[in-house]
């Protein structure tokens, strides 16, 4: 017995397959896989099988069995098969080796280090260490050599992954209906505003960027892109307001990529401390956004337009494995997309320096500043080593820019151009808006009627609470509707999985809280249902903006009852502004609220971002906004020399103007202590 046991033990080896493991497959530890590293197929004939790592300091082994992903499994739930990025220095095999056609350049001044078999198409796909001027070259990547942009070889597999095919439902192909946007008003303001461009052409855009734009099937620039491209190329700061789905992401990515392709990388500064310099990232462009989903989406767009170029995009956000994000940055980080919290964390760890930043972008800037991100933003912009205002370009993009946010933005912008495109802070006429009067107890039955009637396409349902999101999705599943949900209590992996199922149509109904409301570009959403209306009409605008994107059409249905009367006036104005049908019950409740004093955030004619002079107007041009004739408070006050916004009829006081003209609490109301709504009427309450 002992002899048999010894014999069995002698036959075991580290390479022996484990129970349930295919022969030749490496043992793996399950770990989080970010969305940009998922769905990558291994080589034909060996699905899911990782390729054994070549020995240290030896060239990679090209051949039919190699995998461009270093063996990452094609399952969204699979482990990240022995991802062992080595940042070490040392060996003599400094360059990468491309097993495609043609000779490949060897390692540059920052090459060196161990062979990294799992480098994700980074600049050191062949060698460790690295930055954007040295190391190896992965497939689909270019380089900057001696002042010239060397375009990389094509990679059909990566190209298909990035751009899809013409009939791929998971990829959005824009440029279809933008000809209809030619009559949309565009209002630039500022000193010496450059003339807009009318087409994607060279000049002004780099020829390689144009080829990537063509691969993405963009045909003509959107209104915001027509103006933002020449404004940024001419070195100006920009504050851009444009309706949701109007191409804001391209509005900042196109000119930044163009400048990067023509000017090349900034030199790495001399650093004391020796051997850790290669482990710190020195991006030249920083894009900040408020949510994990939005930064992932911007990153995927950046990958498209950086294809075959020297620019290496990276993404960092909370809720994901920080180790994999650090390894990605070590392989080159020229354009960084980040959430503020994770970026501050990495700065504190000494892994990111902002001293080379040429371009700072704040996407969904109003939400980041208005909802509590201001301290983190100010620390990143003003408290670290980022170049000061005037030494960098700062771009702010969003669908709404209320006047108080514009005033805060002055600290980040220098001699900027304010760009208002279309009905900013409003909704697109491409969206057909319907408002139905539905009591809370009837919402489920009415929802079922709508889903039966509007079968087909993707339907996004917004609710107010996490509990309701799970409850409603379970109810729909029990009614034989393929549904899933997304909210803040679900893990990052669960949220990304739910979004993927929704995007590819396997679960065409998504129930969501506000976590998915802003910025997410989900193609082919044909119907948005506000099961629970938000208390802020700006949130309503962003919710329904998930459909009707990129010039296409969509339907937005809202369930309204008297519990939502706090936004009735603004909702009414919104419908009229977008030439939508206004139901009679909405007019009736609006009149009741005007004279009966319903509480809530009634913001009148001079209100925040809507009506007369609001969030789509450059506040530098005008003074104070007056109060509205409604139950809500008065409008926001004006600029430095404007008068404070007075209270509306029956309403409490509005915000005042700038400190020079009375500060918050200008007008008659006496500041924040004024009524929030109508203190004397039904439903009114003090702000405090």
UniProtKB/Swiss-Prot annotation:
Enzyme Commission identifier(s): 3.6.4.13
Amino acid composition bias (Low complexity), ranges on this chain: 17-27, 42-51, 66-75
Motif residue range(s): DEAD box: 363-366
Annotated Pro residues bias: 52-65
Protein location: Cytoplasm
Motif (Q motif): 198-226
Keywords for the protein's UniProt record, in alphabetical order: ATP-binding, Cytoplasm, Helicase, Hydrolase, Initiation factor, Nucleotide-binding, Protein biosynthesis, RNA-binding
Residue ranges constituting the Helicase C-terminal domain according to the UniProt record: 430-590
UniProt cross-references to Pfam families, sorted A to Z: DEAD (PF00270), Helicase_C (PF00271)
Residue ranges with Gly residues bias: 87-99, 124-139, 595-615
Molecular function terms from GO: ATP binding; ATP hydrolysis activity; eukaryotic initiation factor 4G binding; G-quadruplex DNA binding; G-quadruplex RNA binding; mRNA binding; RNA helicase activity; RNA strand annealing activity
InterPro entries named among the record's database cross-references: DEAD/DEAH_box_helicase_dom, Ded1/Dbp1_DEADc, Helicase_ATP-bd, Helicase_C-like, P-loop_NTPase, RNA-helicase_DEAD-box_CS, RNA_helicase_DEAD_Q_motif
Superkingdom of the source species: Eukaryota
Disordered, as annotated region: 1-141, 593-623
Protein name stated in the entry: ATP-dependent RNA helicase DED1
Organism: Chaetomium globosum (strain ATCC 6205 / CBS 148.51 / DSM 1962 / NBRC 6347 / NRRL 1970)
Lineage of source species: Eukaryota, Fungi, Dikarya, Ascomycota, Pezizomycotina
GN (gene name): DED1
């Amino acid at each position: 017995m002992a002899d048999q046991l010894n014999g069995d033990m002698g036959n075991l080896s580290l390479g022996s397959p484990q129970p349930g493991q295919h022969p030749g497959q490496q043992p793996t530890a399950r770990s989080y896989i970010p969305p940009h590293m998922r769905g990558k197929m291994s080589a034909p004939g060996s699905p899911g099988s990782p390729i054994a790592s070549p020995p240290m300091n030896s060239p990679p082994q090209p051949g039919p069995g190699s995998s461009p992903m270093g063996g990452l499994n094609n399952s969204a739930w699979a482990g990240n098969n022995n991802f062992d990025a080595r940042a070490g220095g040392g060996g003599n095999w400094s360059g990468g080796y491309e097993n495609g056609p043609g000779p490949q350049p060897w390692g540059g001044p920052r090459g060196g280090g161990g062979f990294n078999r799992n480098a994700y198409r980074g600049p050191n796909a062949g060698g460790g260490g690295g930055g954007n001027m040295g190391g190896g070259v992965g497939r689909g990547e270019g380089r900057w050599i001696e002042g010239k942009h060397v375009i990389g070889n094509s990679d059909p597999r990566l190209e298909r992954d990035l751009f899809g095919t013409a009939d791929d439902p998971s990829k959005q192909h824009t440029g279809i209906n933008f000809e209809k946007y030619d009559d949309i008003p565009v209002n630039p303001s500022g000193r010496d505003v450059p003339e807009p461009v009318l087409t994607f052409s060279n000049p002004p855009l780099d020829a390689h960027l144009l080829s990537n734009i063509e691969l993405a099937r963009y045909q003509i620039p959107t209104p915001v892109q027509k103006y933002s491209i020449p404004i940024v190329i001419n070195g100006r700061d920009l504050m851009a307001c444009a309706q949701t789905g109007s191409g804001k992401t391209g509005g900042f990515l196109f000119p930044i990529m163009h400048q990067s392709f023509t000017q090349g990388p900034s030199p790495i500064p001399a650093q004391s401390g020796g051997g850790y310099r290669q482990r710190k990232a020195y991006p030249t462009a920083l894009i900040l956004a408020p949510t994990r989903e939005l930064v992932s989406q911007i990153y995927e767009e950046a990958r498209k337009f950086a294809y075959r170029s020297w620019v290496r995009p990276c993404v960092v956000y909370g809720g994901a494995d920080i180790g994999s994000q650090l390894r990605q940055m070590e392989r080159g980080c020229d354009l960084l997309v980040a959430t503020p919290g994770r970026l501050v964390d990495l700065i504190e760890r000494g892994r990111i320096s902002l001293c080379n930043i040429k371009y700072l972008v704040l996407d969904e800037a109003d939400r980041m500043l208005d909802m509590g991100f201001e301290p983190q933003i100010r620390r990143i912009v003003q408290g670290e080593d980022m170049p000061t205002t005037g030494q960098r370009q700062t771009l702010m993009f969003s669908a709404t820019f209320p006047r108080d946010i514009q005033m805060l933005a002055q600290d980040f912008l220098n001699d900027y151009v304010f760009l208002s495109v279309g009905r900013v802070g409003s909704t697109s006429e491409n969206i057909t808006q319907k408002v139905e009067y539905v009591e809370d107890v009837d919402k489920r039955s009415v929802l079922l009627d709508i889903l039966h009637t509007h079968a087909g396409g993707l339907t996004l349902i917004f609710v107010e609470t996490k509990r309701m999101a799970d409850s409603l999705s379970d109810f729909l599943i029990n009614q034989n509707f393929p549904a899933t949900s997304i909210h803040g209590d679900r893990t990052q992996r669960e949220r990304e999985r739910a979004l993927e199922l929704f995007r590819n149509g396997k679960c065409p109904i998504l129930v969501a809280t506000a976590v998915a409301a802003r910025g997410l570009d989900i193609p082919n959403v044909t119907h948005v249902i506000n099961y629970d209306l938000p208390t802020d009409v700006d949130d309503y605008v962003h919710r329904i903006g998930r459909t009707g994107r990129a010039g296409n059409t969509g339907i937005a249905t809202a369930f309204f009852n008297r519990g939502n009367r706090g936004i009735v006036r603004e909702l009414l104005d919104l419908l009229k502004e977008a030439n939508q049908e206004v139901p009679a019950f909405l007019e009736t409740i609006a009149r009741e609220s005007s004279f009966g004093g319903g509480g809530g955030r009634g913001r009148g004619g001079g209100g925040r971002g809507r009506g007369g002079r609001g969030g789509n107007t450059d506040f530098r041009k005008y003074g104070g906004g007056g109060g509205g004739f409604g139950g809500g408070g008065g409008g926001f006050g004006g600029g430095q020399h404007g008068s404070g916004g007075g209270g509306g009829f029956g309403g409490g006081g509005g915000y005042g103007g700038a400190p020079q003209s009375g500060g918050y609490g200008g007008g008659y109301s006496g500041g924040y202590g004024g009524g929030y709504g109508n203190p004397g009427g039904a439903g009114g309450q003090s702000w405090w």
